Amino acid sequence: MQDLDNLHINFSPSSLWVLNAILGFIMFGVALDLKWIDLVQLTKNWKSALVGLFSQYILLPFTTYLLVLIVQPSPGLALGMFLIAACPVGNVTNLITKVSKGNVALSIGLSSTAHLLAAFVLPLNFALYGNLYSPTASLMRQINVDGKEMAWLVFLIIGTPLLLGILCQRYFPRFTELSKVWFNRLSMLFLAFFIVAAFASNGKVLVDNVQKVAWLVILQNGWALGGGWALGKLFKLPEADIRTITIESGIHNSGLGLLLIFQFFDGRGSMALVAVCWGVWHLISGWALAWYWAQRSPAV
């Protein structure tokens, strides 16, 4: 699968700026829904909160490393898997949790915490496992990834819009209340348009090569969902909390991952394919779970 690294993904500097803006717009919309009470609620449900954070920040990156050791993909694919595992949760987890009859308050608290800590946790986990696996360590030395620069970019993309959204909520509460639904809808619409445009520019490349990567993405996503579910069961959490942690573990911000790939890895084909496949598959698996759980009320 080494030839995947040489794939050319048509993604111009202007496209990178557009993706930056869309992700910032999405995070601003997320912040309009963020309330400090959501974070306070985590302390009241501390056991489930700790299990959820452990699943996201420690279990998934570690099990991804084990998966890479077992299947031994090309260094580019492995780096893509490590990066996605390190990315914070996707912004649709709260909605999927609601449809799944999970604990929405827990979902909001976990996803908010994940976004607030992303600038620190993402570069740390990526550097740890990227350097721990020798084939990717060699590749990272060749590329010379700057962890501080990555952390700063993640903060700009996620932290700045979050801060602006929180300030907007604090000083312009009426505007926030009237606009937050539209911000969320428009951000999803902009992202959908961007994905369609990107696919139109790279359709043949993606169609010809997606089967080489899809099985790895499905396997990793299955491990993520299964790991979150198993951890919740192990700690005997309420069923609604288990559903929430499962979803929070399996839905990741692949858009952020794709942006970092083009910013720091010159759009390396194998890494980009992992991020693109994740962006599609985690929605399929997440909504499939939501449909299944929507038919079944959680045990009390």
Stretch-by-stretch model annotation:
Residues M1-V300:
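Alpha-helical transmembrane segments of multi-pass small-molecule/ion transporters
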